[in-house]
Structures are given as structure tokens and as C-alpha cells.
A protein has these predicted regions:
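Catalytic or ion-coupling anion/metal-binding cores of large enzyme and transporter domains
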Residues: 9, 33, 53
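Glycine-rich beta-alpha junction loops
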Residues: 18, 65-67, 89-92, 132-135, ...
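Residues immediately C-terminal
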Residues: 34, 38
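Conserved N-terminal Rossmann-fold NAD(P) cofactor-binding segment
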Residues: 1-30, 40-41, 45
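Hydrophobic/aromatic beta-strand patches that form the interior of the parallel beta-sheet core
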Residues: 15-17, 33, 61, 85-87, ...
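Internal alpha-helical scaffold of NAD(P)-dependent oxidoreductase catalytic cores
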Residues: 78-80, 98-133, 143-175
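Rossmann-fold NAD(P)-binding glycine/threonine-rich loop
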Residues: 39-119
Length: 175
């Protein structure tokens, strides 16, 4: 019963929309988390639109999994840059506790602290601070772990199912 109530409450907080017809509905937001296609041109175009409608205090975070902040911020004002950072969620978001945050060179301490507090205290995430390098830290380390696991699987003659049974839920990875 509580799950049904929680789902109903959540559905009132989330409204589906698109960037062409519904962007104006974001004009009073304090935090916008962008999660669109991983293309610099698309992100820059969206940030141009957001900068025109958001209040000056609004924080904009990108959920990019590896695009550089420097490139995403080309053409943005200093005010926008100080309220911008990366919030890299790991999938599946509802199960993965990790949230990698990445500051840009102009990101203010106030913005960084507010997003860290929000991620930790409101979303219940474990926060790590990454660097503005290609694919940040989580993906760069994760791919090496994945390749080592595949190598060990092949070397030991294990099946993918064997590896999943060892490295999946027993090690707190979602199944």
C-alpha cells in the first residue's frame, strides 16, 4: 500500500515534457538536471535556451557520462558557469548509490556544496568528486574493471551467467 501511495505522490512531482513545447515550465526551477543526447552541439543549444529563461540563482547540472565541461560551457555567461556542474548518475539510478560530481573551473563553492548536500541528504547517494577529464573517474575506472572481469571469465572458462552469479547481487550490484 505504501508503494502505491509513494508512486502516486511521485507522479504528481514529475511531468513529462519536451524542450520545444515545455521549456518555459522550468522558468521557476532552482535545479535543472539535463539528460539529453551526448552531443556537445545539442547540450550547448539547450543551455542557451535554459540560460534565457532560468532565474539567476538556478543551478544547471549535466548528467553527461563523459563530455568535458569546458566544451559544454562555450558561449555561456560567467553567471551560468558559476551555477553549472556535472551530476553523473549511474544506472540503474534507483539502485546505484554512486553519484559522481564534477566541478568546472568557474563552478562556485556555493553551487558545489548545494548539489553535494542535495545528492547526499535528499537523494541518498554516495558522493564522489571527479575531475573534468574525458569520461570522468567512474567510467574510466569502471571500464578497466569490466575488461579485467571479462579477461578472467575467458581465462577460467566461465560463462557470463557464472560471472553474474558471482559479481551481481551477491556483491550488491543490481541484477
Amino acid at each position: 500500500h505504501f508503494e502505491t501511495l509513494a508512486a502516486a505522490a511521485h507522479s504528481r512531482l514529475v511531468t513529462a515534457g519536451n524542450t520545444e513545447d515545455d521549456l518555459a515550465s522550468l522558468s521557476t526551477c532552482d535545479l535543472v538536471i539535463e539528460a539529453i543526447i551526448e552531443r556537445i552541439d545539442a547540450k550547448q543549444a539547450l543551455f542557451t535556451k535554459l540560460e534565457a529563461i532560468l532565474p539567476p540563482h538556478a543551478i544547471v547540472a549535466s548528467n553527461t557520462s563523459g563530455l568535458r565541461i569546458k566544451e559544454m560551457m562555450e558561449g555561456r555567461t560567467e553567471a551560468f558557469k558559476k551555477n553549472f556542474l556535472v551530476m553523473h548518475f549511474f544506472n540503474p539510478v534507483r539502485y546505484m548509490k554512486l553519484l559522481e560530481l564534477v566541478r568546472g573551473p568557474e563552478t562556485s563553492d556555493e553551487t558545489a556544496n548545494a548539489v553535494e548536500t542535495f545528492g547526499r541528504d535528499i537523494l541518498g547517494k554516495g558522493i564522489v568528486w571527479g575531475k573534468d577529464t574525458p569520461n570522468f573517474v567512474g567510467n574510466r575506472i569502471g571500464v578497466h574493471g569490466m575488461m579485467a572481469t571479462i579477461g578472467a571469465m575467458l581465462e577460467m572458462g566461465l560463462s557470463p551467467e557464472d560471472v553474474d552469479n558471482i559479481t551481481g547481487k551477491p556483491m550488491a550490484h543490481p541484477g
